[in-house]
A protein has these predicted regions:
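Short, well-ordered beta-strand segments
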Residues: 1-2, 49, 97, 145, ...
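Central regulatory/effector-binding core of bacterial HTH transcription factors
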Residues: 1-58, 209-213
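Alpha-helix/helix-capping structural signal
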Residues: 5-6, 76-77, 132, 150-151
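C-terminal effector-binding regulatory domain of bacterial HTH transcription factors
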Residues: 21, 25, 149-154, 158, ...
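Acidic, Gly/Pro-rich loop/turn segments at junctions of secondary structure
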Residues: 31-127
């Protein structure tokens, strides 16, 4: 199975453990990838994958699991003594971090109430394909970042990060379980699909104690 790093190292380990406990004779190869380098699942021996973002491969069945909210964050040290920015125009003037998988040189934010959208260019000081590296760089005060709310929640609770322009958010990212079309699906895949779908709201929902930030 192919899983994005952030989910594969954290939130999906518990259901994977339950799956293995329920099926004692089962073995799982757990591959962590944030890109989509594998195109032929059958040739690669891959049963299924968790994909974040829009599924564009017409050869894959895509089961929607959730949408992950994304917010704008930065370290207090980056902001100095001033008030955290409240509007997108203020964000454009700050140093930025980029998560190459989802944004590089441009950011678009949507107002949570009015639905109004604002788009502006950024010149990242730091660019990465790792959500963990992005969060760490943000905590160190390197720049402003856009990341999954569940991923940033612990650092927000500890005061290592603050949310900027809280009335504005980046578009949520869809999370899907995907697998190739086939005439027959093995029982191991059907059981895993059942488990993930039954726990999707818990797995991909908000972090406990995040207070909606």
């Amino acid at each position: 199975m192919i899983v994005p790093h952030a989910f594969g190292q954290d939130r999906l380990i518990a259901p994977l453990a339950r799956y293995l406990q329920q099926h004692a004779g089962m073995a799982v190869e757990w591959l962590l990838h944030d890109d989509r380098a594998i195109h032929d699942y059958i040739a690669a021996g891959v049963d299924c994958a968790i994909q974040v973002g829009v599924v564009t491969d017409p050869g894959l069945v895509a089961l929607p699991l959730a949408e992950v909210p994304r917010i704008v964050v930065a370290a207090p040290s980056l902001l100095g003594d001033g008030m955290p920015p409240q509007e997108p125009a203020e964000l454009a003037a700050l140093p930025w971090l980029a998560l190459r998988t989802y944004y590089r040189t441009e950011v678009e934010l949507t107002h949570g109430v009015s639905g109004k959208q604002k788009r502006f260019a950024i010149q990242p000081r730091f660019s990465t394909d790792s959500l963990y590296a992005l969060r760490s760089a943000a905590i160190q005060g390197v720049g402003v970042a856009i990341g999954s709310r569940w991923m940033m929640a612990p650092a927000l609770a500890r005061g290592e990060l603050v949310q900027l322009a809280p009335a504005w958010q980046a578009a949520p990212l869809p999370v899907s379980l995907v697998y190739p079309y086939a005439r027959f699906y093995p029982a191991r895949l059907r059981r895993f699909i059942e488990l993930i779908r039954s726990e999707a709201s818990t797995l991909f929902g908000e972090m406990p104690g995040a207070d909606g930030v």
